[in-house]
Amino acid sequence: MATPIKETRQDDVVTVELNGYIGENSPLFEVSLHRVEKLVIDMSKVNYINSVGIKNWILWSRNIPEDCKMELYQVPPSVVTQINQVAGFLPKQAVMMSIQVPYYCDTCSKEDTRVYELGKQYQLGKDGEDGTVTHPTDVKCGKEECTYTTDVLESKFFKFLKFHKPS
């Protein structure tokens, strides 16, 4: 089944909310970008992207006009991984405004994600410097005696902070 989307247009801004997975038949790839100056994509409900979805994303994103700003919100871990591993996945004009970071509780084995926002928990690099990430401390999992920790290898998950410099 194709990923359902909700598309809204207001003047020269297109907002797309994705739901499910990004695959071969995702209607995202059919969104018209004619006269669009800003493209906002909400990925909060995306659960994964398959290999054909990756290929189609790259082909589709090459057609985004260079002067069109692209903002990605709540990018899920599966997509962050692709951004870090696949050259050309994230267009130069794109900015990840927020990402979902996996967390794990060693005490009760509970898994969850936390949303990190650009300018709060992570910063993009400037003037040749690498970006930075600041993790919240003492993140409770819901039980008094339990505390979450990030469930990622920081050097791999936040690799995009080293190479992505939006135009």
Model regions and ranges:
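Amphipathic alpha-helical interaction surfaces in cytosolic regulatory modules
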Residues: 13-97
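Acidic/polar residues at beta-strand termini and the immediately following turn/coil
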Residues: 8-10, 42, 104-105
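Arginine residue identity/basic-tract feature
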Residues: 6-9, 35, 62, 114, ...
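Surface-exposed beta-strand edges and flanking loops
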Residues: 7, 18, 74, 152-154
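Cys/His-clustered metal-coordination modules, chiefly Zn-binding fingers
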Residues: 84-167
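Short beta-strand/loop segment at the start of cytosolic alpha/beta domains
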Residues: 1-15
